[in-house]
Curated annotation (Swiss-Prot):
Cofactor(s) in the UniProt record: FMN
Gene: azoR
Residues at which FMN binds: S9, S15, N16, S17
This protein's name: FMN-dependent NADH:quinone oxidoreductase
Keywords for this protein: Flavoprotein, FMN, NAD, Oxidoreductase
Native source organism of the sequence: Bordetella bronchiseptica (strain ATCC BAA-588 / NCTC 13252 / RB50) (Alcaligenes bronchisepticus)
Enzyme Commission code: 1.6.5.-, 1.7.1.17
Taxonomic lineage from the root: Bacteria, Pseudomonadati, Pseudomonadota, Betaproteobacteria, Burkholderiales
Amino acid sequence: MKTLVILSSILGDRSNSKQLADHLLARLKQSEPGGTVKIRDLAADPVPYFDGATVGALFTPAEARNAQQQRIAALSDDLVAELFDADRIVFAVPVYNFNLPAQFKSYIDHIARAGVTFRYTAEGKPEGLVQGKQVLVLIARGGKSEGTPDDTMTPYLKQMLAFLGMTDVTFIAAEGMAMGELAAQEGLALARQRIDALSLDARQGLAAA
């Protein structure tokens, strides 16, 4: 299988969400020795935030773009191509102030492309085009808000990913990362256990074993 990993924490190797991604990748290395992994770190190599030039480039037909617009659109095209090429997509996302990092939101803006990753039917209903993917969202959160109104990021990501066609999505959160060393270690351990309990068979989708 081809696995695409999107990292988004600004903390690099000290990132708790990256630790979860590393744990998953170690498991995949054993269970899928013939698989391939592509890692994109949005903090180390950020995608540009949306501006007028970006919107103009993406909404200009490819054959009508000037040289600058071609360069701008090429990055978005590459990000989208990675999505379609992958069998499994892993998003490692920390929670910053109740929501996702700005660099991850910018990434979403680049991959949400009308006519490319989603379209509208004749009835005006949206149809996601990034289909048939296993998606795993690994979250690191300072407090403990899973399943409460304070968790505003998970509902947004569920809606956004479904809008793009990604419906086989599993969320695993390491909570309590800012509640002291003991709570953080317990939160990471529980999240690792949940990762270990996953069935990663592409034919079955992501499910607890």
